[in-house]
């Protein structure tokens, strides 16, 4: 019987082999990276467009442009897209971050012809229907109002605004009225500027076959797609950090308190970034980290405390997050 009082030996990894992707330049100039690793007949396709919060002209423009891609195209409405993806056992993920928008498809290899047809329509010919947009905006407003009563949400907003300043895209806080300013025309403007072949890169992973690469090249790599083929210019933003070191956001009706501690830190391009990621993981990035073992296991102050690096462009944020009984922990 296993004696759980005996701690397992700590062993150093003997060898860590990281497979390198194959880099291909498609005929229309789109870079394609292929990581052929996997035994199951499944492929993941990622299309990245260099257009996120740092490039938008108004708050939420990048987010809703990406979010609305699946809500209707010239060939399929939202119900047809959802039904077809479900029928073929595929999964579509849409997300928007600081610098990039992501369109991700998981598909069984045997149904790639059908699922890639849907993916092509979503990327190349969205229509941003007004009715569906109105429903999604209303739902997001309700979620925003719910979140606005949560102490961890308010603490995070207070931290990034204090570190970056209200005019920096990292510290510019979304308000309820920003949702109401989103229209199909606003989304179409952002789509035309950033969703095109000269601003796109593609990544394939899983059990990638030659047929899959051929189909990707046929749909996204032979001819240019989009309307505005200018490469987006990178705009540099400079943080304006507040002089105050302690900021209090009062919520008299709140049942909990949240603490966020943070400082401007490294971005992904810094030579010490990966070392810092490992260090912060040991400090507070997983269940057995130092923060968790000290604050939760030893002192019993909370169920959860964590630390992380948020790698925003230019300067990231090193943050420690905690929500529960504030006074004893401090």
Model-derived features: positions:
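A short, hydrophobic C-terminal helix/tail in secreted or cell-surface proteins
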Residues: 326-330
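His/Glu-rich zincin catalytic helix
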Residues: 1-83, 188-294
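Charge-rich, well-structured scaffold segments of protease-associated domains
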Residues: 1-6, 25, 36, 80-231, ...
């Amino acid at each position: 019987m296993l004696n759980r009082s005996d701690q397992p030996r700590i062993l150093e990894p003997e060898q860590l082999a990281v497979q390198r992707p194959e880099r291909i330049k498609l005929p229309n100039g789109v870079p394609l990276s292929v990581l052929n690793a996997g035994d199951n007949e499944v492929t993941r396709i990622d299309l990245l467009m260099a257009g996120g919060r740092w490039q938008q002209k108004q708050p939420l423009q990048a987010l809703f442009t990406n979010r609305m891609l699946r809500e209707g195209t010239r060939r399929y409405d939202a119900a047809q897209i959802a039904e077809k993806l479900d029928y073929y056992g595929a999964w579509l993920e849409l997300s928007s971050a600081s610098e990039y928008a992501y369109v991700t498809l998981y598909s069984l290899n045997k149904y790639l012809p059908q699922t890639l047809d849907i993916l092509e329509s979503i990327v190349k010919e969205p229509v941003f229907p007004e009715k569906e947009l109105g429903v999604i905006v209303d739902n997001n407003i309700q979620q925003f109002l719910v979140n606005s009563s949560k102490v961890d949400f308010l603490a995070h907003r207070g931290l990034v605004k204090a570190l970056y300043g209200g005019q920096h895209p990292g510290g510019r806080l979304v308000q309820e009225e920003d949702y109401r300013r989103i229209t199909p025309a606003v989304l179409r403007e952002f789509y035309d500027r950033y969703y095109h072949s000269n601003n796109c890169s593609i990544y394939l992973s899983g059990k990638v076959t030659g047929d899959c690469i051929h189909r990707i090249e046929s749909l996204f790599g032979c001819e240019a797609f989009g309307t505005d083929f200018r490469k987006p210019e990178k705009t540099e933003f400079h943080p304006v950090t507040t002089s105050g070191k302690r900021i209090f956001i009062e919520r008299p009706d709140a049942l909990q308190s949240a603490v966020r501690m943070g400082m401007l830190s490294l971005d992904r391009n810094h030579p010490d970034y990966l070392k810092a990621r490992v260090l912060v993981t040991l400090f507070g990035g997983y269940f057995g980290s130092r923060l968790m073992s000290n604050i939760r296991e030893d002192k019993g102050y909370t169920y959860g405390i964590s630390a992380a690096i948020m790698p925003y462009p230019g300067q990231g944020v090193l943050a420690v997050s905690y929500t529960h009984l504030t006074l004893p922990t401090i």
